[in-house]
């Protein structure tokens, strides 16, 4: 049986929209918010007024400013931060990850300093037992937050991981 709890690391418009979607289909979402003031505001108002204004966050979304708290023992972690911050975030998260964690990248781009792709960054920083996948597609945060029909692709080196992630996001 699937654990109905997921960590979303990054509360920009895309991370917030994915959190809303996951909460609407029954997942408890630990949403890591980098900005402490924004985290407190989201807790108070149940809205991310800076990155995704006008959308009420479901009760199943639990904002936190602590990466350790955001992981909270979850084995599915969605990374939704700008590429140039991914390496630092993963280094910080590593001690809190379960050996069988599934790390899903929902960003795009390359690391400016090293010219590494996100996949390369994940391979260099994560324990070898962690599985890695990418979520991508022609979607917009506001459309996903509104619950409009969307198509998104998940890719992983392991078909079983791709299918697992697909079942999580499908509704």
Sequence positions of predicted segments:
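NAD(P)+-binding Rossmann beta1-loop-alpha1 motif at the extreme N-terminus of oxidoreductases
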Residues: 1-55, 62-65, 92
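Short acidic-hydrophobic sequence patches enriched in Asp/Glu that either
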Residues: 30, 34, 114, 161
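Exposed alpha-helical structural elements
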Residues: 37-38, 160, 164
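Rossmann-like NAD(P)(H) cofactor-binding subdomain of soluble oxidoreductases
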Residues: 57, 67-72, 76-149, 162-166
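A residue-level signal for beta-strand positions that form part of recognition/binding surfaces
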Residues: 60-61, 151
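Short beta-strand-to-turn element immediately C-terminal to the catalytic PLP-Schiff-base lysine
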Residues: 153-157
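Short, intrinsically disordered, charge-balanced linker/junction segments flanking boundaries
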Residues: 167-171
